[in-house]
Amino acid sequence: MSDVTPHPALRTRFCELVGVKYPVVQTGMGWVAGARLVTATAHAGGLGILASATMTLDELKEQIAAVRSKTDAPFGVNLRTDVADIEARIAVMVDANVKVASFAQAPRADLVSGCKEAGLVVMPTVGARRHAEKVAELGVDAVIAQGAEGGGHTGQIPTSLLTPDVVAGVGKDVCVISAGGWSSGAGLVAALALGADGIAMGTRFLLTTDSRVPDEVKAQYLATPVTGTVVSTRVDGAPQRVVRTDLVNKLEKSSWLANLPRSLRSAHQFRSETGASLWSLLKEGRAMKEGSELSWPQVVMAANAPVMTKAGLVDGRTDVGVLPTGQVAGVITELPSVEELMGRIIGEANATLDRLSL
C-alpha cells in the first residue's frame, strides 16, 4: 500500500464507508478491469472494481478468487442489471466477501435491498441529477456521477456542473464520487471542493503498467491530444466517447443501415463469447428500448460495443475496433504503476491543500 499519509481532508466518509485508505476509485472498464488491475488498486489504497459485463459467471468467479487470493483489502464488482444471472453473480460476490456492488445502470429496488441486506455497499453510476435522485430513493449508499468528459458511454453534462448538482440532489446520506476528467491530486481536491466524497478514474488507471491493455494500444492513447476524442453514436447507438481513429471517422460518416451487418455479427460473437442466450439478448434489447429514446436500429447496434471494444483494447485492432477514452487521455504522458500513481495523486493533493490553506 502507498505509504503517503493523506491530509485529514482526504479521509472522507467514502473511505469509512468502504474501508479504503484513499478516496479514489478505479472504474470497472470492460476488458480492462481484471484481477491484476483491481489487486494493484487495492494494494495501493484505492477501491478497484472488476468489470463483470464482459465475463461469464465462471469467469467472474475466477477473477474474484484471483483478487481475493492476493489481498484482503476491499474491492468491488461492476454489474449490468439486465443480465439473466444477476442474482447468481451477487451471490458469488457475497460468498467472496466483496465489498461494493457497482451498477452500470439504475438497479431495481429488489436488487438494492438484497445487496444491502447481504452487506454490500451499493453504488450505481449516474449521468444526471434526476437519475441520482431516483436511485437515492431506492436506498443506495453511493453514486458515481460521471460527467461528459468521461470515457465510454457518457452524458452531456460537464463534470464541474454535474458533481455539485448530484450532491445537492441526493442529500447528505449518499456519498458522491465524481468521475470524468480526473487524473491528478489537484483534480481530487477540486472534486472535493465541488462537494464530492472522492473521485473515480478509468482512463488514468488504464494507462498504467498494471493495466493489461497491450503496450501498442497504450501508446496510441498517449499520442491522443485533448481534441483527439469524439462522442459518437455510431458504435452502438448510444453516446460513447472514443479515440478518433480512421475507423471512427468512417463510422461517423456512415448510416445505421450500413452498420447493421456489423451489428448482427457482433451480437452473434458476443453471445458466443459470454454464453448469453438469444432470449437474454432480446430481453436486454427490449429493456434498452423501453428505458431510453433509442430506436430499434440503435438497439440492434448495441451489440457492437463489447465486441468492437475488445477488438481495440484486447487485440489491438484499431482498424476494426474502438478505444473508449476520457478526454483526460490528452494530458496523460506516462505509464506509472498503480502504486506510483496513487502515491503521486495523494502527494499532489496534500500539497494542493497545504497551498490553499496559506
Where are these regions (language model features)?
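Active-site entrance/lid segments in N-terminal catalytic domains of soluble metabolic enzymes
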Residues: 1-175
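Residue-level detector of alpha-helix initiation sites
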Residues: 32, 181-183
